[in-house]
């Protein structure tokens, strides 16, 4: 019996949700004609945990440990947006020292996030060496986090009105040592990767996004800046004390996967510049606004009275969120992370809407992979940089 040499029908392949290069529980239904991608349908929701609904049944302080499970590789940013929202809503001022500490922690977290993007991205392309190199530097950042917050990940460090604790003795010197060491590490990455001809073959011209497309799709972060749009919230809508530091927005005009790589590597250099300036200029003073703890404080009940409360530990400060609404945003490593908060004169938010950058950046994936080769899916998906905890929430 003779078999046909070629088949004309299309093949449908499931990639994920347990595929190692999916960067989480993402499932792609890919329609192939040989090696050519005809269609791609992302299936989301495998990691949905109802984070927005949980927020409506918790006070802000009770909700803080939950938010580190969105983007679990850049947890400082989820904490920052969670405390910034009620601070803006109630017009709570934070001390200058606390603002500088926040900036230092945010930029260290940005570097750690970009490092853990770079390693798996290179592994997806077949280069294993950088995957091990990035953990060397990332471990030093986590040592700094552990010394300041007590936790390597899921720090729970930011508080309404400041931070949970001041920087320990000797921490600033260790941070400066890391900055000097890391700049040499970035040079090593560029020597190893940027001019590698095999790497350039895999990324140049792959996953092209024009500036107009990036704006129309609502992309943000390195995805937007790699398409020629100089938009960084730290410059255009400053928060914390970013307007007091000298640094440049990293951008490229090519719009391909190589441009997104160059933007992120450049951002790591700029983050080091911001950290060095913040550490050298950090002011003295308190690390939290103690007045927040007295905000709408209940009167002390008399001993053995009907309303007397036996407290095993000092309670967290709670206050009512006034009846108004606002949108707050920060420049996270993956793009614009925003919160739309609605208060209704109660301890709990009436609405807590999360604007995750990864979810919106992922929407352009089917357009990028069409008419590309099957192997290019890994390159394009890796260059987007997604974390499914943030995408599915």
Swiss-Prot record:
The name this protein goes by in its record: NAD(P)H-quinone oxidoreductase subunit H, chloroplastic
SUPFAM superfamilies for this protein: HydB/Nqo4-like
Keyword Thylakoid applies: yes
Location(s) in or outside the cell: Plastid, Chloroplast thylakoid membrane
Organism of origin: Triticum aestivum (Wheat)
Sequence similarity: Belongs to the complex I 49 kDa subunit family.
PROSITE patterns: COMPLEX1_49K
Subunit note: NDH is composed of at least 16 different subunits, 5 of which are encoded in the nucleus.
UniProt-listed GO biological process terms: photosynthesis, light reaction
Catalytic activities: a plastoquinone + NADH + (n+1) H(+)(in) = a plastoquinol + NAD(+) + n H(+)(out); a plastoquinone + NADPH + (n+1) H(+)(in) = a plastoquinol + NADP(+) + n H(+)(out)
Enzyme superclass (EC): translocase
Keywords assigned: Chloroplast, Membrane, NAD, NADP, Plastid, Plastoquinone, Quinone, Thylakoid, Translocase, Transport
Membrane topology: Peripheral membrane protein
Gene Ontology cellular-component terms listed: chloroplast thylakoid membrane
Lineage: Eukaryota, Viridiplantae, Streptophyta, Embryophyta, Tracheophyta
Chief location bin: plastid
Domain of life: Eukaryota
GO molecular function annotation: NAD binding; oxidoreductase activity, acting on NAD(P)H, quinone or similar compound as acceptor; quinone binding
InterPro entries named among the record's database cross-references: NADH_Q_OxRdtase_suD, NADH_UbQ_OxRdtase_49kDa_CS, NDH1_su_D/H, NiFe-Hase_large
HAMAP family: NDH1_NuoD (MF_01358)
């Amino acid at each position: 019996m003779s078999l046909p040499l070629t088949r004309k029908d299309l093949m449908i392949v499931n990639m994920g949700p347990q595929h190692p290069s999916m960067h989480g529980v993402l499932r792609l239904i890919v329609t192939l004609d040989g090696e050519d991608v005809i269609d791609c349908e992302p299936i989301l929701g495998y990691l949905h945990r109802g984070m927005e609904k949980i927020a409506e049944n918790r006070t802000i302080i009770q909700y803080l440990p939950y938010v580190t499970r969105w983007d679990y590789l850049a947890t400082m940013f989820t904490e920052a947006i969670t405390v910034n929202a009620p601070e803006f809503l109630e017009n709570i001022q934070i001390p200058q020292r606390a603002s500088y500490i926040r900036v230092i922690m945010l930029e260290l977290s940005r570097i750690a996030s970009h490092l853990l993007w770079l390693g798996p991205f290179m592994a997806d392309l077949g280069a294993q060496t950088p995957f091990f190199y990035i953990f060397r530097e990332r471990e030093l950042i986590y040592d700094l986090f552990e010394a300041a917050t007590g936790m390597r990940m899921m720090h729970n460090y930011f508080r309404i009105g400041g931070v949970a604790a001041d920087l320990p003795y000797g921490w600033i010197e260790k941070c400066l040592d890391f900055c000097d060491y890391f700049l040499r590490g970035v040079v090593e990455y560029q020597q190893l990767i940027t001019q590698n001809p095999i790497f350039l073959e895999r990324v140049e011209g792959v996953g092209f996004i024009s500036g107009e497309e990036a704006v129309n799709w609502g992309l943000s972060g390195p995805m937007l800046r790699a398409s020629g749009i100089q938009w960084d919230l730290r410059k255009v809508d400053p928060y914390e004390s970013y307007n007091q530091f000298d640094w440049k927005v990293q951008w490229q005009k090519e719009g391909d996967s190589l441009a997104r790589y160059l933007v992120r590597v450049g951002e790591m250099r700029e983050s080091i510049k911001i950290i060095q300036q913040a550490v050298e200029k950090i002011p003295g003073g308190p690390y939290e606004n103690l007045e927040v703890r007295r905000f709408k404080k209940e009167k002390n009940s008399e001993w053995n009275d009907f309303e007397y409360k036996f407290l095993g530990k000092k309670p967290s400060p709670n206050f009512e969120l006034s009846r108004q609404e606002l949108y707050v945003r920060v420049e996270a490593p993956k793009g614009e992370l925003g919160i739309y908060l609605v208060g209704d004169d109660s301890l709990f938010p009436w609405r807590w809407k999360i604007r995750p950058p990864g979810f919106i950046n992922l929407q352009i994936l089917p357009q990028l992979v069409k008419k590309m080769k099957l192997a290019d899916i890994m390159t394009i998906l890796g260059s987007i940089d997604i974390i499914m905890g943030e995408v599915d929430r």
